[in-house]
């Protein structure tokens, strides 16, 4: 007889405070919620929320993605969020509204868009 391997069921940890990282590009919006140490709790994208093509880059798609990510975070017992927004995309503000609509308390909003201090040379100009 083969012995059954006893595996314990993984219990979900209760995380009350977290950080929401919103990466808004011109083509997509990625919402990722981490705990205070940077470990990923849940994530969602506007492309993964059922939007394809040019509709993926709309503010409404970002709001839906942030809402679904907020639902997943509530399942972990999350209540308070700090929001870090990165990028120039159209889904910046509406993603914050989507998180707020789920009942998560937003404590602070920080813009962490990387800005070069005259670093690398940009690529050549497009000629259409």
Swiss-Prot record:
GO terms for biological process: translation. It comes from Vesicomyosocius okutanii subsp. Calyptogena okutanii (strain HA). SUPFAM superfamilies: Translational machinery components (SSF53137). This is Small ribosomal subunit protein uS11. Located on the platform of the 30S subunit, it bridges several disparate RNA helices of the 16S rRNA. Forms part of the Shine-Dalgarno cleft in the 70S ribosome. The keyword Transmembrane helix does not apply. Disulfide bonds: none annotated. Gene3D superfamilies: Ribosomal protein S11. GO terms for cellular component: ribonucleoprotein complex; ribosome. Keywords: Ribonucleoprotein, Ribosomal protein, RNA-binding, rRNA-binding. InterPro entries: Ribosomal_uS11 (IPR001971), Ribosomal_uS11_bac-type (IPR019981), Ribosomal_uS11_CS (IPR018102), Ribosomal_uS11_sf (IPR036967). Pfam families: Ribosomal_S11. Part of the 30S ribosomal subunit. Interacts with proteins S7 and S18. Binds to IF-3. Belongs to the universal ribosomal protein uS11 family. The keyword Ribonucleoprotein applies. One of its GO terms (molecular function) is structural constituent of ribosome.
């Amino acid at each position: 007889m083969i012995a059954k391997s006893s595996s314990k069921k993984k219990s979900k940890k209760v995380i009350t405070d977290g950080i929401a990282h919103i990466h808004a590009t011109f083509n997509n919006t990625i919402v990722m919620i981490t705990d205070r140490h940077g470990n990923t709790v849940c994530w969602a994208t506007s492309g993964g929320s059922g939007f394809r093509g040019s509709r993926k880059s709309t503010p409404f798609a970002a709001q839906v993605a942030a809402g679904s990510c907020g639902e997943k975070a509530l399942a972990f017992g999350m209540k308070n969020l700090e929001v870090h927004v990165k990028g120039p995309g159209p889904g910046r503000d509406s993603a914050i509204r989507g998180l707020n609509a789920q009942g998560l308390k937003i404590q602070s909003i920080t813009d962490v868009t990387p800005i070069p201090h005259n670093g690398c040379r940009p690529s050549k100009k497009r000629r259409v």
